[in-house]
Amino acid sequence: GLERQVRLTTNIALNYVAEEKVFILNEPKHLALTWGIPLEAELETTLDNFYTKTRAYWRKWVMRTTIGQFHQEAVIRSALVLKLHQYQDTGAIIAATTTSLPESPGSTRNWDYRYCWIRDTHYTLKALNSLGHFTELQQYAHYIENIAINMGAKERFQPLYSITGDSKLVEKIMDLDGYLGEKPVRVGNQAYEHIQNDVYGQVLVSLLPLFVDLRLVEENRRDLLPMLMNILHQVEATMYEPDAGLWEFRNKAQQHSYTFLFHWAGAHAARKIAEMFRDFEMKELADKLIQQASEQLEKCFDEERGVYTQAIETKNLDASLLQLITMNYLDPNSDRAKKHVEVLEDELKTKEGLFYRYKHADDFGEPETTFLICAFWYVETLACIGRVEEAKEIFERLLTYRNHLGLLSEDVDAKTGSQWGNFPQAYSHVGLVNAAFAISKRLDTQIFL
């Protein structure tokens, strides 16, 4: 049984509730479901007051959102999803509010997403910064900062943590049927044990605004420099180490291009901070790591096809490498960048503008559904290289996959258009926001024109 009592307080006739009868609603009715201490105040007045305050809070929050005219409704909806996925006490943002909704029928790719992935930090903070919600940005950055500050100098970052920062997330299979009978139903996530070395660069990039953005800068940031130096040393220590990568392969370690990209980006962030504080030791190490990461990335370049591959010594392609352009590793105007996009399009894009993460078999076979954030990365990349009309067209096509409430899951079946995976998925909505802002920058449309 439950540790505390669950109680329903309502002014609906109790026999209707107890006997689950259908009845005609001809006046407002109120229901309060409580766990533990029951509602003791007057029902109607209390709930009307709660509703009025709640509506006012969310309307004011939306009014404070920085947003252009490009698909404003969709961006606002995604911003609300992002806000609702944040745990106010610590600032953690979970990947999704559900567990074990399958990525595709019969795939057994059923995961518990009710945790905070460090990897998502860069994308989430970028979206919050664009939306102008600095309180949420600071809360999330401080969550990451608190995890980092409590780690030992040589301790590894995990890919994910609980909303309170707990590290042990043991995966268990529950004796439940699952959504549409799709088993297994998992609680916990084994990925917390994975080696995913891109997280160090992600943390450095994510903490950068706390040092350089004048709207966010706090005094006495110098005391965090030893922590940043420890993280930079972790980049150095893991530079040549194979890992599970962005897609969390369970039985396959490689030297992933995506990891090198964030080693490169994280070292750039550290160099900016070092220059601010005239920390020559940190700057020297950052410069060395930028060079090493670039050299490793170039080992992933397939000269014959003109594309960067998923990892060193593989021909497999990966949609995450669209970000070589959006993160300015490649010059968006260069022939190399444009050819790289074309090859990824040819192999991973569907005719609907959806994108597979990759097409090769993994621990569970070949992927059957497309990954929504990859499609939004593609839109962002198109805007970046100047193919703005195509970016707009595909963005608008992606909006058609939302449900009647404007919500997106993790995956879409390209053949049927059905949504799969945990829902709603913060990653997908972050992708929507960042893609919309990338297009808006290119359009530069004034509201009065």
Regions found by a protein language model. Name each.
Residues G1-L449:
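Acidic, mature catalytic/reactive cores of soluble proteins
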